Amino acid sequence: MRGTRLMGLLLALAGLLQLGLSLKIAAFNIRTFGETKMSNATLASYIVRIVRRYDIVLIQEVRDSHLVAVGKLLDYLNQDDPNTYHYVVSEPLGRNSYKERYLFLFRPNKVSVLDTYQYDDGCESCGNDSFSREPAVVKFSSHSTKVKEFAIVALHSAPSDAVAEINSLYDVYLDVQQKWHLNDVMLMGDFNADCSYVTSSQWSSIRLRTSSTFQWLIPDSADTTATSTNCAYDRIVVAGSLLQSSVVPGSAAPFDFQAAYGLSNEMALAISDHYPVEVTLT
């Protein structure tokens, strides 16, 4: 009996050690994330609960001109320790008066930010830019995983231009390679990569999909929406042998927070109409 208990304890400790050495990453489109949402204590508590699952999380649809909502979120996340989460945030992005930011939240005890940049996609006023919201790129150093340095490219595509924007992510990858001499890159976000925005016949024209360089971790069969639709809008794509070999098999999936927390449809949709998509690295 004592030996059985000891074995159980050792297995539990091994599991905790493995958890400590792994890295959990997600992309989460929080619909209209701003002061109104973060002023609702119930919604804020669920958002905080979801974010705390991750070591790095990309939040999209940040509608927060003065970063008041971002500040509130960080206050909640760091209420016990001011260094639990740090952040990187983009400038407001968009071709017209409607603007969004990309927000990266990360645990500094697990990763460090080495560099950041905003992808230059051409002349917006000339009408020859590639993206409605130019991808934000962050280079991370991981303290524990097989891949020690990797970049994350964030994209929330414009639904009407999803095919062209996803295709243009191929050029963003080449730009990251050239700028940082880095092959290990994760491209993620709400690509609007399914249903009427990207049809099955259009995939053959998307280089990010046809090139063998890239692995698509969230399949077309996934449902990343909290609505009645069944669409794999949100994706995680990885390139580079070290990063690809660091992915825990079967770990990439949407996180259905409605089912996990027993929420009503109304409450789930109040949080967001998208589920986070997540993956674990070791």
UniProtKB/Swiss-Prot annotation:
Glycosylation sites: N40
Cofactor requirements of the protein: Ca(2+); Mg(2+)
Site, as annotated: Involved in actin-binding: E35, V89
Keywords from the named record: Actin-binding, Apoptosis, Calcium, Cytoplasmic vesicle, Disulfide bond, Endonuclease, Glycoprotein, Hydrolase, Nuclease, Nucleus, Secreted, Signal
Catalytic activity: Endonucleolytic cleavage to 5'-phosphodinucleotide and 5'-phosphooligonucleotide end-products
A matching Pfam family: Exo_endo_phos
Disulfide-bond pairs as recorded: C123-C126, C195-C231
Signal peptide (from-to): 1-22
Compartment(s) where it occurs, according to its Swiss-Prot or TrEMBL record: Secreted; Zymogen granule; Nucleus envelope
PROSITE patterns: DNASE_I_1, DNASE_I_2
InterPro entries xrefs: Deoxyribonuclease-1_AS, DNase_I, DNASE_I_2, Endo/exonu/phosph_ase_sf, Endo/exonuclease/phosphatase
Residue numbers marked as site, Nitration by tetranitromethane destroys a Ca(2+) binding site and inactivates enzyme: Y87
Cofactor binding, note field: Divalent metal cations. Prefers Ca(2+) or Mg(2+).
Membrane-traversing stretches: none
GO molecular function: actin binding; deoxyribonuclease I activity; DNA binding
EC number, UniProt record: 3.1.21.1
PANTHER family linked: DEOXYRIBONUCLEASE, DEOXYRIBONUCLEASE-1
Function field: Serum endocuclease secreted into body fluids by a wide variety of exocrine and endocrine organs. Expressed by non-hematopoietic tissues and preferentially cleaves protein-free DNA. Among other functions, seems to be involved in cell death by apoptosis. Binds specifically to G-actin and blocks actin polymerization. Together with DNASE1L3, plays a key role in degrading neutrophil extracellular traps (NETs). NETs are mainly composed of DNA fibers and are released by neutrophils to bind pathogens during inflammation.
Family: Belongs to the DNase I family.
Name the UniProt record assigns to this protein: Deoxyribonuclease-1
Organism: Bos taurus (Bovine)
